[in-house]
Amino acid sequence: DGVTDLYGVMWKPFDFDSTKHYPIISSVYPGPFYEYVPTQFDFIHGRNTQLAQLGFIVIAVGHRGGSPMRGKYYHTYGFGNLRDYPLADDKYAIEQLADCYPYIDATRVGIFGHSGGGFMATAAICTYPDFYKAAVSAAGNHDNYIYNKWFTETHNGATEEKKVVKDSVNGDR
């Protein structure tokens, strides 16, 4: 939005050389109750170190709609649209980093995540297929209305839409 600061962490290979060009991978989990930016070295983010050692720049960036600790506007940014709210921020962060750091190759961009991060990775490559060249979606919850009702209604709102269900025994209901 040009106003909200986004915070993140970058992992580089142990043998990092600033004269080389590295593909970048975004490690994601969209929240909306959690900012997927580590403040310590831990097991959950260990795969980011492993990917960096394979020759990638790896990032984890917070996005609008994440942590409630950054204020109501920031936290509720994604309310009503759990699919799209983190995508633009992730893409923008990668573009900004590539502009600042010439060793990042913005033509070779990947994204991966688990659960909500898997959902986000799939949505990202489907929404921006010319930008993201690869995506890994581990256990993505791709339909939040059947994933977890309390979570969806809390963070996306309740819907009263009537859906037609196909029933092979009794016909449509």
Model-predicted segments: where are they?
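Serine-hydrolase catalytic-loop signature spanning alpha/beta hydrolases and amidase-signature enzymes
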Residues: P32-Y34, V58
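A flexible loop/linker signature enriched in serine peptidases of the S9 family
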Residues: V37-T39
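Flexible, glycine/threonine-enriched loop-and-boundary segments that flank and lead into catalytic domains
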Residues: G2-D15, D99
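Charged helix-capping and loop-helix junction motifs
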Residues: D42-I44
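Active-site-proximal cap/loop segments of hydrolase catalytic domains
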Residues: S27, R47-Q50, L54, A60-R173
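Alpha/beta-hydrolase fold active-site loops
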Residues: L6, P23, R108
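Short beta-strand element of the alpha/beta-hydrolase
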Residues: K12, T19-G31
